[in-house]
Regions:
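A short amphipathic helical element positioned immediately N-terminal to and/or at the very start
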Residues: 1-15, 304, 308
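Alpha-helical segments in transporter systems
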Residues: 5, 16-41, 211, 243-251, ...
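An intracellular "coupling" helix at the cytosolic face of ABC transporter transmembrane type-1 domains
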Residues: 13, 172, 180-184, 192-197, ...
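ABC-type nucleotide-binding domain
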Residues: 18, 54-57, 68-75, 80-85, ...
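Juxtamembrane helix-loop junctions of ABC transporter transmembrane domains
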Residues: 31-48, 254-297, 301, 305, ...
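ABC transporter TMD-NBD coupling linker
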Residues: 42, 49, 392, 408, ...
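Short intracellular "coupling" helices and adjacent cytoplasmic loop segments at the cytosolic face
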Residues: 47-54, 61-66, 73, 133, ...
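Helix-loop-helix
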Residues: 335, 339-356, 360, 366, ...
Length: 552
């Protein structure tokens, strides 16, 4: 923590730029987290629901308006009628978006019941009629005989005209559907069906709907809205295209904004990193030029060169990366978790498992490589030392024929550094393939679990897509923090080495009050002077009085 404080202390003069970076990263994270939701909406609303978001039709014919109230309670009818206004022979919805979102929950049951009764397959219709006939003790028609009858024959038997139409089913086959609502209206008008009967039908359908799932329910509601809009003369295909273009345009705008913010953040982070590097170089240079031979011997010239170049470069690089990753990772991670909870996918355990597996992988790799990272800078110092000694004493080496020996010294220092770098790099090469394997494994697991939930009607395809993206964002945020945990210790060591130079004072200290020599005589005098070698416990010279006269 002490090393980290030294690292962060270097950034304090640039706090105002860091605040701007933090705010811009918030904007970038907002855009990044919005894109999966737009993708989900395009799939679920734009493609599956034909661009229709709400279950109440934008426009509906008068006949359909009356049929829609068939399964509504009195309170629901009042609510329904309050948001529609009659224009010619159609009814137009006047509710705003907030009201429509509220009514999606309040009127979902009667709207879905209306949709199912208006689009009942031939098999479901016969089953419903058979159950109704079984409750009549005077009935002599069996279910088997009913199955053999056509819909027209059933209508003749019931003395009613049944409304039928043909449409493609989910398998692309043309099948016959029955609209049972006119029949129910006739039964109500004739007194054959009472409100209690309608309530029983509603309860029966509600039990059936509960087993379908809320996701499928809403899709059925929007399908009803689309059919009503089409009957009222609206171009549903045009509505769908407009929705897709609108959502796609928003996605493009978000992407461009995110790109612009990322460029600005990268520029500002680089400026801060370069500024920190400049300040540290200035401080080190100011200190080193005032060092005596004692301090130069303590650090060695090679080490000072490494600290002034490689160590500062390390801090400069980590500072820029840290302002991009260390600040961004928590924002995107927390935002991703919030968005995941909003999807209602109930697969948070997959994210927890992925994070734990990645943590285990990173901890294993870190435990192997971190000790090597710590000695890396010392090995760079050793290589610089040997290189400088060879270059400085090149003429002496040639004079005494020690070229072979010096080559061996350099090769040894070079091999030590190379072996360490190769070891760390080889170990760390397992990280990215391991991460990719985990991420793709998590994606497959999400798709597998989601497939069962989609089949049960508890999840939509778009929500699954959004959940996968949010999961990847959370995992990547954790991965960013992990990568920083690798970089920060090395930068912390570099900061400690630089701070060691900056905090070292020269052993030659001038008096605060300097004496001005008016007359230069060239005479040197020692009065009660003591001397000891650096690090020694005792003085080797004590209480020395000495006078050196000019020319003597």
């Amino acid at each position: 923590t002490g090393k980290m404080r030294k690292l962060f202390k270097n950034m304090l003069p640039y706090w105002h730029i860091i605040v701007v970076i933090f705010l811009l990263l918030g904007v970038q994270a907002y855009c990044d987290l919005s894109l999966p939701q737009y993708t989900s909406d395009i799939i679920d609303v734009g493609i599956q629901n034909k661009g229709i978001k709400y279950i109440l039709p934008e426009k509906m014919p008068e006949e359909e308006y009356r049929l829609a109230e068939l399964f509504m309670t009195e309170d629901e009818k009042d609510t329904f009628e309050a948001v529609y206004e009659k224009k010619d022979d159609t009814y137009v919805c006047t509710a705003d978006k907030e009201t429509l979102e509220t009514l999606d929950d309040e009127l979902l049951t009667p709207i879905v019941l209306t949709y199912r009764m208006a689009n009942m397959s031939e098999t479901d219709f016969k089953n419903t009629i058979a159950e109704a006939l079984e409750q009549n003790p005077q009935n002599q028609i069996t279910k088997e005989s009913l199955d053999e009858m056509s819909i027209e024959e059933i209508g003749q038997m019931m003395q009613m005209e049944l409304a039928t139409y043909e449409a493609e089913n989910d398998d692309g086959e043309m099948v016959t559907y029955v609209d049972m609502r006119p029949m129910m209206q006739q039964l109500i008008a004739s007194g054959a069906m009472t409100q209690d009967g309608i309530a029983q039908s509603r309860e029966y359908m509600e039990n059936m709907i509960d087993s379908v799932g809320s996701s499928t329910l809403h899709a059925m509601g929007t399908a009803y809205a689309a059919s009503c809009d089409e009957k009222a003369g609206l171009d549903v295909e045009h509505i769908q295209k407009n929705y897709l273009w609108s959502e796609g345009g928003k996605m493009a705008a978000m992407s461009l904004l995110m790109l612009a913010v990322a460029v600005v953040v990268g520029y500002l982070a680089s400026r801060v990193g370069a500024g920190v590097g400049r300040d540290l170089r200035e401080k080190i240079f100011g200190k080193v030029v005032g060092f005596s031979n004692t301090e130069m011997d303590k650090f060695s010239t090679a080490s000072l060169i490494t600290r002034s170049t490689n160590d500062i470069q390390q801090i400069q690089f980590v500072t820029a990366i840290m302002l991009r990753m260390l600040l961004y990772a928590p924002i995107i991670g927390i935002g991703g978790i919030y968005k995941v909870l909003k999807t209602g996918a109930h697969m948070e355990w997959i994210i927890v498992m992925a994070v734990l597996v990645i943590s285990g992988l990173v901890m294993v790799l870190m435990s192997i490589t971190l000790p090597k990272f710590k000695i890396m800078q010392k090995l760079v110092d050793a290589l610089n030392l040997v290189s400088r000694e060879i270059l400085t004493g090149l003429s002496v080496i040639r004079a005494f024929g020690r070229e072979k020996k010096e080559e061996e010294r350099f090769d040894e220092a070079n091999r030590n550094l190379t072996r360490t770098q190769l070891f760390t790099n080889r170990v760390m090469t397992f990280m990215m393939p391991g991460m990719m394997f985990i991420m793709y494994g998590v994606t497959i697991l999400i798709v597998w679990v989601s497939a069962h939930r989609i089949d049960a009607g508890q999840l939509q395809v778009g929500a699954m897509t959004a959940f996968i993206t949010y999961t990847m964002q959370i995992v990547m945020a954790f991965l960013m923090l992990t990568m920083m945990s690798i970089m920060l210790p090395r930068a912390g060591v570099a900061a400690d080495r630089i701070n060691e130079v900056i905090t070292t004072n020269s052993s030659i200290i001038e008096k605060a009050e300097k004496e001005t020599i008016e007359k230069h005589t060239g005479k040197v005098e020692f009065h009660h002077v003591n001397f000891r070698y650096p690090g020694a416990d005792e003085d080797v010279l004590e209480d020395i009085d000495f006078t050196a006269e000019p020319g003597k």
